[in-house]
Amino acid sequence: MANFDLTNLAVKMICPNNVVKTDDTDLPSVLVYIPKFKNSDVLTGGNDSTHPAFIVNGVEIPGFYYGKYQAKVYNSVAYSLPGEDPTASINFDTARARCEAKGAGWHLSTNAEWAAIALWCKKNGFLPYGNNNYGKDSRESNYKAVPSYYESGKIARVATGTGPISWSHDKTMAGIWDLNGNVWEWQGGIRLVWGELQILANNDAADPDNPQNATSTCWKAINAADGALVDPESKTTDSSAHVSGKTVKLDYVNNKWTYSTSITNAKDESRSCAFYQVAADSSIGDAAKVMLRALALLPDSDVTTDVYEGDYMWWNNGVAERCVSRGGWAYGASAGVFSLDGDGSRGDALTNLGFRAAYIPEIR
């Protein structure tokens, strides 16, 4: 038996849902398997449809493999490895390329996949902690991870997987690490164009054959009445928003983000509210709300208090295109698995902005 097979066997003996997977470079990444489930398995207001993370190009998949660790790039290829300073200062398109360089099935984490994991965490009663306060979680005083990068004399990033067990998504060694803080993580398959929410269908963003460049025709808007995916009203080449009253938009009303078919308050700046405060007005139908909740973009139907432990959502609805990252950075309780930053240009390359790779073997 090869040394790699022994390594994989040893990992699976300790963490049965983990796998050490080599890519086209014959180098390993550690992945966590997420099996298929329905919206109703993780959402009070969910239907019995398969969660979108488990549908690619119209075909259901049994599950997906998610990077156990934030990505580290070596020789222009992304890896999921413990004890590494996660690669940051990387823009959206380059992050995608570093994941796709691993070979067939490999891709940048998609928002659908991130949402599936976040909703699973919430349903199972545990939202992971992480490096959101200079090397530690703002709610923990005694735990710190191994520093890997400093800014202004303070710990900015920590080595992947070196935090306490509370930094794992399922609070075990078998879980996914650092989903809360450390670096924001780019997510594929979602953007905002002049305030209009645009996505790729289900988890189609996992397939590199479905382009995500600024002018790709794979981008779709959401019909507010029935949740169907339709051609967008607004394009990145437009000079302002196009609003017909049919597709889902993001409006900023009474200092909180509200899904609507109209935009009464558009600004080219980052504005925020607590995730539990995000709302949908009467123009958004039930099917569209289920889709938004399944993508961890709207609180569950029974939420009236901050059960998301302070996670925040930022958007910019007054500019041609903004891409999305999730998880947070040095924002204390505002960081977390439901935290979202929708104010990033696809060209942004910041020291607090990284990514994570995922793998679906059915994509060839």
Label every PLM stretch briefly.
Residues K21-G105, W194-I263, R322, G354:
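Extracellular adhesion/carbohydrate-recognition regions
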Residues N75, F126, L192, E362-I363:
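A generic secondary-structure boundary signal that marks alpha-helix termini
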Residues S49-L179, P208, N223, K256, ...:
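Short aromatic-cysteine micro-motif
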Residues M1-F4, R139-R157, T162-S166, D170-L179, ...:
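C-terminal, surface-exposed recognition/capping segments
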Residues M1-N18:
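Charged, compositionally biased non-catalytic regions
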Residues E113-A116, I190-W194:
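Amphipathic alpha-helical scaffolding segments
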